[in-house]
């Protein structure tokens, strides 16, 4: 494994083979994918810390889905990736849908966890309010946001019986730069749905039955619009799928890539 920086974007690079590019969600990092790396051993895997998140440099201007997608394109171009299997979580799935519809030549397949096309209209104001809280309160605000996310975005079973998963989620969120997190929130709040009917690559959509961000009925509706896609719903699982159900995610990815990768 090596850590590389592309225009101040941190990228963890592992292995050799076809490229796989991993795009985390809001409050995430390259560590979101640690639990499923065993399914990616056949690939040259690029785990990106998105602009303004984790170890990547803070940004001075606004973030948007367009700018996040362009950052992924730049990482791929600079690291010699012409086509890649894309993996995404949450906000990262919106970026993946953007790339698959606007740069289909880049995308071999999609494996998406907690996928959504854009936030429901009623959620946008709350996301903007979270951005403002992060800016106004700084580190204490991030700690409070992390606690709220653990309470609202993980399953009851995870909170009761998977303390390591809870710790991973909380640590991931509360260690974000407050301003970078706020800008990422604003990108999510402004996201618009991609025309996913045009997606022709193999697509895996995974969610949990207690995922309020990507509820099963919404994920199935996305799957109905993508020809040949597979939808998987884990029981007693919330939004942080790879942390809450690591073994199941690992097996599902192994099966998916056995069918759709060299």
For each feature predicted by the language model, list its residue ranges.
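Alpha/beta-hydrolase fold catalytic core
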Residues: 1-21, 41-44, 81-82, 151, ...
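Conserved HGGG/HGGXW glycine-rich cap/lid loop of the alpha/beta-hydrolase fold
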Residues: 9-58
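Conserved acidic catalytic loop of the alpha/beta-hydrolase fold
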Residues: 67-84
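Flexible "cap/lid" loop of the alpha/beta hydrolase fold
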Residues: 97, 101-102, 106-138
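Conserved alpha/beta-hydrolase catalytic His-Asp/Glu region
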Residues: 121-126, 137-197
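Catalytic active-site module of serine/aspartate enzymes centered on a nucleophile-bearing elbow/loop
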Residues: 229-262
